[in-house]
Amino acid sequence: MQVTETLNEGLKREIKVVVPAGDLEAKLAERLETARGRARINGFRPGKVPTAHLRKMYGKSFMAEIVNEILNDLSRSILAERNEKSATQPEVIMSEDEKEAEKVLDGKADFVFSLNYEVLPAIEVKDFSKIAVTREVVDISDEEVDEQVKRIASSTRTFETKKGKAENEDRVTIDYLGKLDGEPFEGGADNDAQLVLGSGQFIPGFEEQLIGLKAGDEKVITVTFPAEYGAAHLAGKEATFDIKVKEVAKPNELVLDDETAKKLGIESLERLRQVVREQIESQYGQVTRQKVKRQILDALDGDYQFETPQKLVDAEFNNIWQQINFDLQQAGRTFEDEETTEEAAREEYRKLAERRVRLGLVLSEIGEKAGVEVTEEELQRAVYDQVRRYPDQEKEIYDFLRRTPDAVANLRAPIFEEKVVDHLLANINVTDKKVSKEELTAEDEDAASEAKPAKKAAAKKKAAPKKKAEEGKSEEA
């Protein structure tokens, strides 16, 4: 067998392999001899089937198996002998000449093929102990906890029908029909919708115009959808809503006690406060970690500059680009609406893909050198979390994960990355800084999540006047 390197440029490699016909023939002879003892063919005693007859019956199928085994085994062994790691599965290039392929299967021609691949770059882990990051910390006040407890407990609040005019904090039950230029628009109507005035549930200007109405009243109100509204065909547009008030109800006093907590499934008010505080701490902690992680990645980005495997970059870019176009389509927007062009966006996200790949390789090398591993328990927990996202499809998801090693690898990767970040945090300079919750959560274009750094168009929502339809703000790296 001849193995010849025919390309060595940067990370690109091409290896030409020639397996002599004689070697193939020898492997085939071994396989035919093994088959002779097992074959049961009419007219022949066991173990007495002539080799020529076996070759006629099984020769090509056996040779095809031999060729596939050679491809699988040599791809691994060649990389191991060269002490190289392929960034992706090596591409096998063979002759497309059918006559040539027939000769190989008949044992009359050498088996010639090439392996094309990109090697993972050699990365020397640098001293990261001098990396310095600021960890923003928020002190959670009792007032904030109580405010959140009250907000949660308000779902247990009861209302009592009243005859007077609707006031702030009253609950109104209404039918509404939204119109643009006098024509009803999709998703702009609802019956028996319940709205607590002053809750901010609907878009600005809607709730205020219902104050003072009584049950049985009808009114046409005019509102303007926010410019950043999720449904692009409504964003910034003036619309009218035909309103019919069916009931006005006043809120009963909200009592915060153990009974209220029990209605929420918590044993006591004190335990409810504790749960709420833990939730707030977790929410702020996630934001803090993302900001710290971004600082670490930015520092590593400045320390490591090297050529990245283009196939990995291509795959990452395609994932990003597919998501970007899906988001734009869902929102009914274009690149021009985002104040850019497709060409400029491609360039931006190509750079982003290259950064992601490079940092991924750096984190992988740091983790490997540090002995970071993902335990089976951690992986099983990730599998369980994944399955929980698809209720009533548990069996299908489990079967898919069993059949698809890459899917399991995709679950393992983020766990590994977070453990590497933990390792870095334990070995770099971290300075805590007390900030307000407003400072912590303030939008920062350069501090968006590295896991999802692509700027996303707002998702299309039901075209109702509900304020929550505005959600889906953009993110960018």
From Swiss-Prot:
- Which Gene Ontology MF annotations are present? peptidyl-prolyl cis-trans isomerase activity; protein folding chaperone; ribosome binding
Q: Which reaction does it catalyse?
A: [protein]-peptidylproline (omega=180) = [protein]-peptidylproline (omega=0)
Which residue intervals define the domain PPIase FKBP-type in the entry? 169-254
> Which intervals carry biased composition (Basic residues)?
454-466
Compartment(s) where it occurs, according to its Swiss-Prot or TrEMBL record? Cytoplasm
Please give the family membership noted in the entry: Belongs to the FKBP-type PPIase family. Tig subfamily.
First-level EC class? isomerase
GO cellular component terms, A-Z:
cytoplasm
Disulphide bond pairs: none
Task: Briefly state the protein's biological role.
Answer: Involved in protein export. Acts as a chaperone by maintaining the newly synthesized protein in an open conformation. Functions as a peptidyl-prolyl cis-trans isomerase.
- GO BP terms: 'de novo' cotranslational protein folding; cell division; chaperone-mediated protein folding; protein transport; protein unfolding
Extract the HAMAP family matched here.
Answer: Trigger_factor_Tig
Q: Which organism is it from?
A: Brucella suis biovar 1 (strain 1330)
Q: Where is this region: Disordered?
A: 435-477
Name the UniProt record assigns to this protein: Trigger factor
Keyword vocabulary terms for this entry: Cell cycle, Cell division, Chaperone, Cytoplasm, Isomerase, Rotamase
Quote the biased-composition stretches of kind Basic and acidic residues, using this chain's numbering: 467-477
Its UniProt domain note says: Consists of 3 domains; the N-terminus binds the ribosome, the middle domain has PPIase activity, while the C-terminus has intrinsic chaperone activity on its own.
Gene name per UniProt: tig
Where does the source fall among the domains of life? Bacteria
InterPro entries found in the cross-reference section: PPIase_dom_sf, PPIase_FKBP_dom, Trig_fac, Trigger_fac_C, Trigger_fac_C_sf, Trigger_fac_ribosome-bd_bac, Trigger_fac_ribosome-bd_sf, Trigger_fact/SurA_dom_sf
EC number(s) recorded for this UniProt protein: 5.2.1.8
Q: Which SUPFAM superfamilies match?
A: FKBP-like (SSF54534), Triger factor/SurA peptide-binding domain-like (SSF109998), Trigger factor ribosome-binding domain (SSF102735)
